[in-house]
Amino acid sequence: MQERIFLNHINPVKDKIYRLALRLLTSRDAAEDATQEVILKLWSRKDNIKHYANVEAFAMTVTKNYCLDQLKLKQNSNLRIVHQNYESKQIPLQKEIEVNDEMQWLGRIVDSLPEQQKLIFQLRDVEQHDYDEIAEITNMNHTAIRVALSRARKAIREKLIKKHNYGIK
């Protein structure tokens, strides 16, 4: 198979290879490396590519297998490091106190919101309802829900920033 024909088969799926690698490896650098390695593997099998009915599926399988191999290698090396540097999984007391304090502040801020904004914020950001469910519960249209949610988030953000910057400015 000539290089041009190979590239005609691979270029359309190159972006999908990268996105799959990025999703599995969660690092752009690792995903780029994986993409290059997969393309090299496909090039080494270029004479067999014409026998595959779906080149894209074959490329995705090669990508998945390569990424899983990389994750296994990384996991094994991480296990060695963890055994050598074992640390307690218990959250430090200071961090726990800070998180509890921050949650109390957030609760007070949410309680100070207008009732409609508080309800929509609770339904969308805390309980993870979608807009259709919120519209059904509140008898509001999607635009009004988005506006109220945006205002609630903005008010929360501004009050948290004001709290965090207290005494600094």
For every predicted segment, state its role.
Residues 162-169:
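Short, basic, alpha-helical segments at the C-terminal edge of helix-turn-helix-like DNA-binding modules
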Residues 120-124:
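A short pre-motif secondary-structure segment
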Residues 19, 33-40, 44, 53-65:
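Structural recognition of an alpha-helix C-terminal capping motif at a helix-to-coil junction
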Residues 69, 77-103, 108, 130-133:
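Internal acidic/polar
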Residues 137-162:
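DNA-recognition helix of helix-turn-helix
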Residues 29, 132, 143:
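Residues within helix-turn-helix
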Residues 1-19, 32, 43:
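A short, charge-rich alpha-helical start-of-domain segment used by transcription regulators
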